[in-house]
Amino acid sequence: MKKALVFILILFAATISLTAKLIPVLDFTAFLTFDNTPGGIEGFDWRSANGLQNPQWWETKQDYWYDAFEKPAFLNLGFELDTDKVDMVVLVDVLQDIFVQIRDREKIYTNIPFLNKANLDLSFPRVGYIDYTSSEHLIYLSVGRRQIKWGPGTYGMAISDSQPYLDNVYFNVTSGISDRWKFSYDLVALAFKHYLDIGEEAEGAPQTTFAHRFSFSNPNFRISFTEMNNIYGKVPTFLDWTPIALWHNNYQDDCSNVIVDMAIEAKLGSVRLFGTLTMDDFRLAEEPNTNPTAIGASAGAEWNVISGNPFLGKEFSNSRYAIKDESFHVPGGLNLSYEFYYCSTYMYNRAVSAGKFTSDFQINSNVGPKKFYDDDAFFLGFKYGPGSIFHLLSLSYESTEYKIDFKASLLQRGSYYIDSPYDDEYKSKYDPLRLPGDVTTVLSIGSDFSYYPQGGIGMDVSVSYTRDLTHDSGAFKLYAGVKIAIADYLSH
């Protein structure tokens, strides 16, 4: 069997080599950061930690994880295989041990391995997939590890790029249905692994999340309807992911958490309008035994004030490989935008971790707790999670070689978290549509500047200040980095 498999792989490689283009990836990013953000709980305590990680600071453990993995890798090494219909990406991204970025708050640090008394993060790879595109782009299929982002805004409510990667199988079919209208159907399967300790499965495991979406679009308008089914505590069957039927009432309430989502985007001249409405549960007054109402919503507007040339600098982060929706966003020139997000108290939640719409993550750390597992490390949907309201104002300008943007945001978040108990007592403790308990208010302002005289060579500088108005504390961040895509540079 092994010999036959090897022979098939050799034959496949020989066949595609006739039409394939092999593109090496050798990207370096070196940066220095000053960050006096207060540190949080470190190590195994995070497994049972709930809410704020520091009593004088607004961040939860999900915020710490997101911030750590948002920083670029020191080295991306691998290749991209490009054929007429089949593409493949194999990538190893070399980071510092991720716990260094959490432990070394309140000081200057870099992403270069073996500095700051740190070695390599062993949790890679975070990108690796193969995909297929049929003639005329009718069918698309992707299998592997990469990010996915659905939705027209900066942040998604259903599936977002708030986690480093998702192990997934992705299928799409797109077809014209009239002179102006197109129809698109997406089907996605996401796999998660839940472990407390070696050989011991976490409560509620296994976990598999399915999503399907029906979309209609024309040159000025898009609307999509999404349904997500999180199956936990059992191995899924065809009933759980049957492609066309609705999943919301498949008689598996004890093993299934279903979310529905609607997204709209429209273009009116130089203005883009967009919004989403997401529902996890909805309780009527006559239904006291159901789960509490859980909804999310977003709305935004973007104005292309002055048209211009789009920025041509290379994207070095793993998000360049993400599966993302098409958008009416106009790149280049001056853009002004405002976005609003609301996520109610009980969104994404269930009594066991595997039932929540979260992404688990296992860290292999040689400077921290060695093998460490967090079952609610990232939100599958909205970055800031349930019980939150978020405002984002952005002004950006970009041309061929540089771009600059200014951002101001206001976050309000209650004190009931995704890790809080989800039982009968807590389901009735808070008004499901109001921010729960004590509310933390956070104001942040910042600016980013990128200059790339050549597409694969550039520098980034960013500065931001965050003020926790509730706890009367603040943090300043300064980032400066240089990037070079060596393979791209040598090819030119």
Short names for language-model regions:
Residues 453-457:
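C-terminal closing repeat unit and adjoining cap/tail of repeat-based domains
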Residues 22-218, 289-295, 299, 308-330, ...:
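Outer-membrane beta-barrel channel domains
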Residues 18-20:
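Boundary at the C-terminal end of the N-terminal hydrophobic targeting segment
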Residues 214, 474-492:
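Outer-membrane beta-barrel "beta-signal"
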Residues 4-14:
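Sec-dependent N-terminal signal peptides
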Residues 138-140, 166-373, 385-393, 398, ...:
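Signature for the C-terminal beta-barrel architecture of outer-membrane proteins
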